[in-house]
Amino acid sequence: MAYPMQLGFQDATSPIMEELLHFHDHTLMIVFLISSLVLYIISLMLTTKLTHTSTMDAQEVETIWTILPAIILILIALPSLRILYMMDEINNPSLTVKTMGHQWYWSYEYTDYEDLSFDSYMIPTSELKPGELRLLEVDNRVVLPMEMTIRMLVSSEDVLHSWAVPSLGLKTDAIPGRLNQTTLMSSRPGLYYGQCSEICGSNHSFMPIVLELVPLKYFEKWSASML
C-alpha cells in the first residue's frame, strides 16, 4: 500500500514483485557506481593541469572501455531476462478470471463459475465512508484466494487500457480484439489497489482496481454467495 511522501516501491506481495525489487536494487547499485566513477573522472579533468595532447592512440584504454560496458550490460540483462521468463510462465492455474476494460470501468468474469461476473466502478468522493481512499475504492472488489496461482485474462471493449496492481508486480495491456494473460499469486491476505495505467480518455484517472486476497475457505463462501 502506498503512503504519503513515499520514495520507494510498495511492499512486495508476490514472488514476482520481490524479484523485481531485487533486480531494481541490483541495477541501481551498478548505475550508482558508474555515475560516481564518471563524476570522479570529470572532477579530475576540471582540476588537474596535466594534459595528453600528444597521445595519438591508447589501445589498452579503448579495449577496457569496450569490454567493461559489455560485461556490465550482460550483468543487467541476464537477471532481467530471468524475471521476464518468470512473468510469462503459466503453471496450472487454480482459477481464471477475465477482465475487460471499458470507458471508464472494469468488468470481471470468473470463467470457472457459471454466471459469476460483475462490473467494478469507482465510488465517487461524495459517497466515500470514513477510512476509504479517494479515487481508489470500488463498488465491487475482485475477491481472490491467496497462495494460489491465478490466471488473469485481460482485454478491452473499446480503447487501449492497462490493468496494473503495483504491489503484485502486475501490468498488462488491455487491447481491443486481443486477449493478454498474466498470473498472480499473493503471499498474504489484504487489499491491493491499482489503476488503469494507459491514458484512455477524460476519465482515465477514475478506473481503480481493488483486489481482495483472502484464504480459500472465505473465497469459497464469497463465491457461493455471489451465485
UniProtKB/Swiss-Prot annotation:
InterPro entries with a match to the protein in the record: CcO_II, CcO_II-like_C, CcO_II_C, Copper_CuA, Cupredoxin, Cyt_c_oxidase_su2, Cyt_c_oxidase_su2_TM_dom, Cyt_c_oxidase_su2_TM_sf
Cofactor note: Binds a dinuclear copper A center per subunit.
Enzyme category, top tier: translocase
Positions on the Mitochondrial intermembrane side per record topology: 1-14, 88-227
Known EC number: 7.1.1.9
Location of N-formylmethionine modifications: M1
Cofactor: Cu cation
Molecular function (Gene Ontology), one example: cytochrome-c oxidase activity
GO biological process: ATP synthesis coupled electron transport
Membrane topology: Multi-pass membrane protein
Catalytic reaction annotation: 4 Fe(II)-[cytochrome c] + O2 + 8 H(+)(in) = 4 Fe(III)-[cytochrome c] + 2 H2O + 4 H(+)(out)
Residues that hold Cu cation A1 according to the record: H161, C196, C200, M207
Single GO cellular component term: mitochondrial inner membrane
Record-listed Mg(2+) binding positions: E198
Transmembrane segments: 15-45, 60-87
Similarity-based family: Belongs to the cytochrome c oxidase subunit 2 family.
Designated name of the protein: Cytochrome c oxidase subunit 2
Native organism: Bos taurus (Bovine)
Name of the gene: MT-CO2
